[in-house]
Amino acid sequence: MYKIVSKKELTNNIFSMDIEAPRVAKSAKPGQFIIIKNDEKGERIPLTIADYDQEKGTVTIVFQTVGKGTKQLAAFNEGDHVADFVGPLGVPSEFIHEDIEELKKKNFIFVAGGVGAAPVYPQVKWMHEHGIAVDVILGSRNKDLLIYEEKLNKAAGNLYVTTDDGSYEFKGTGSDMLKELVNNQGKKYDHAIIIGPMIMMKFTSMLTKELGIPTTVSLNPIMVDGTGMCGACRVTVGGEVKFACVDGPEFDGHLVNYDESMRRQAMYKTEEGKAQLEVEEGNTHSHGGCGCRGDK
């Protein structure tokens, strides 16, 4: 059992929790995720690690209530316990293995959309702790849905906030802001890291390809069971089949087949769609308790 030591509602239907999990906190790296189960019979819910504190032995998760599992999790309070908290899982962000001095010579831009701000934060924080200043674009549909602005502002070299409706700061999308920085403000970037909704990552990656900026995306949104068994996170990258929760979650943003992934993501929301995928691709497994037949 794992204790919930703090809980906050960041904005409407988006929650943050600090979970007491010393072993996970000790080994966690930026870019990784965990699998949480509310109770012994509950669904497996994969969530990106939004922060970790090795001294306190806590791991921070951020989630949006979009299905049965996350709605049940949102009903938990401080002092309650969840049944399972497994991790860290997935491949850590590629840059943590690079030479620090070489990283300092590069210009990085992070683009976070919506709840994508949470998985972007530990990467930006890691950069800040190692003396590497990075630019961050934080985008949302409107001001009320923005999260992690204060945290990212402290860790980023420069933070650019955008809202689709213009209710706060720059009016436009993250792509619009990136275009403004490069084309009108003379910014030059050696690498872009993009995390957010699939459609946002698709169009922002199209822009970075046009601008000649190597790009990494995190495909956390398409994960269901977190082991690759259910096949929901199956994605084609550079013509090869990959599984986001095992081979990723990070991939070359210019090689991902976003349209295929979004189609599969939509089909996995219905039993009819899952059946059709089994006809097209074969039954990836016998649904042995992975949780893929439920929603998060």
Curated annotation (Swiss-Prot):
GO biological process, one term: pyrimidine nucleotide biosynthetic process
Record PROSITE patterns: FAD_FR
Pfam families registered for this protein in UniProt: DHODB_Fe-S_bind (PF10418), NAD_binding_1 (PF00175)
Source taxon at top rank: Bacteria
CDD domains in alphabetical order: DHOD_e_trans_like1
Domain FAD-binding FR-type span(s) in chain numbering: 1-95
SUPFAM superfamilies in alphabetical order: Ferredoxin reductase-like, C-terminal NADP-linked domain, Riboflavin synthase domain-like
Xref: InterPro entries: Cyt_c3_hydrogenase_gsu (IPR012165), Dihydroorotate_DH_Fe-S-bd (IPR019480), FAD-bd_FR_type (IPR017927), FNR_nucleotide-bd (IPR039261), OxRdtase_FAD/NAD-bd (IPR001433), PyrK_electron_transfer (IPR050353), Riboflavin_synthase-like_b-brl (IPR017938)
UniProt GO MF annotations: 2 iron, 2 sulfur cluster binding; flavin adenine dinucleotide binding; oxidoreductase activity
Name of this protein: Uncharacterized protein in adh 3'region
Organism lineage: Bacteria, Bacillati, Bacillota, Clostridia, Eubacteriales
